[in-house]
Amino acid sequence: MRVALAVALFHAVRGLLPGFWRAAALSATALFVMTRIIGPRPGMLTILLVIVLFDILLSVRTTGRTGMLWLLPPMFALWANWHIQFVYGLFVLGVFACEPLLNSLFRYRPQARNLLPASAAWLTLLASTLATLLNPYGVKIYSTVLLYAGQTRVYNEITELRAMTFRQPQHFLAVLLVLGAAMAMGWRRNARPLWLIFLLAASLLAFRSVREIWFLAIVSVCVVADGWQSPGSDVRGSVPLRSRIMVGVWVLAVVLASCRYYGLSNDALEIQTAGAFPEAAVRFVQQHRLSGPLFNDLSWGGFLLWRLPELPVALDGRTNVYGEDRILRFSDVWKGKPGWNSDPDLARANLIITPRDAAIASLLRFDARFQVAYEDVQAVVFARRR
């Protein structure tokens, strides 16, 4: 998936920016900004399809080949059945469809060849929206979208929903990308209003929740690439054979180095998993056949759901399933706030898996209902006394 993201992003940026190495450098910068959120999760398809969507729309706007737009409805049908953030794609497509209106409001006069045909754009938007209804829930899928949008109180409780901490270089580089995009728009003086809307929306999303930093990175490099392009320049000029060979060598070297560094094997994957999640604690539970109900740390919910499918988790990252009130109550219990010991989920639990440094781990050591069954440097397993 990471290779697919890299190839798709480079192709999209290369369509806007003359100069092979410039496009490669911009793409690499955006990918580095996204490194913290790239992983084996459904959202990776959303990132890939947003890049592909930008590439198709920008290509059609330049070439006038509207036939490519009919790739979008089936893409949205797949997207809606895979990940809820397909609405990002509808937003992108909708802004492109509204570009003539935006140009009129901002009194911007683009070249005719740089506009999507209005009828084709709106027809594609309608067809794509209808295609999203081809899912098991039909139109009700949009109620889930609204539910997620309204769950604002949980942003402080889930790490990836919090704002940037600026304790990682990717966060500072994201700011530089935004500033570079703003500079590129100002440099041209006749920047497209379309990019202003995208940059504002991406900034609001990413600076509110670090999980959306990928959208900011994609939009920013597209704005920079479009601003770098001089009018009438040959964007997709031929790339010298020497440059292609050098890129191939570098890509091969990076792949080999990554395989060596990360150790792409099942054993290495187990080591990485054990470092981030309570793998040893899970194995103890499996070996001793401990029974639930299970009370678990929220951030470990998805992992435990995968590793212990026979034990339903108390909570995981699916905020639409559990609701804000339960998540906030759960957070208070985990922090050991007053009333933690009367929580109904805790009262029903026979098994608790908690980080060793969590407040509740210290409190449970003095709770007569539970005893320590297993402990390591990462996690503590409590079992109900019989």
Protein language model features and the residues they cover:
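Short acidic/glycine- and proline-prone juxtamembrane loop motifs at membrane-interface regions
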Residues: I37-L45
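Transmembrane catalytic cores of multi-pass membrane glycosyltransferases
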Residues: I84-R189, A217
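Membrane-proximal, lumen/periplasm-facing interface regions of secretory-pathway glyco-
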Residues: G237-H288, G301, L308, G317-T319, ...
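Membrane-interface alpha helices of multi-pass inner-membrane proteins
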Residues: A30-M34, I56, L69-I84, A127-T132, ...
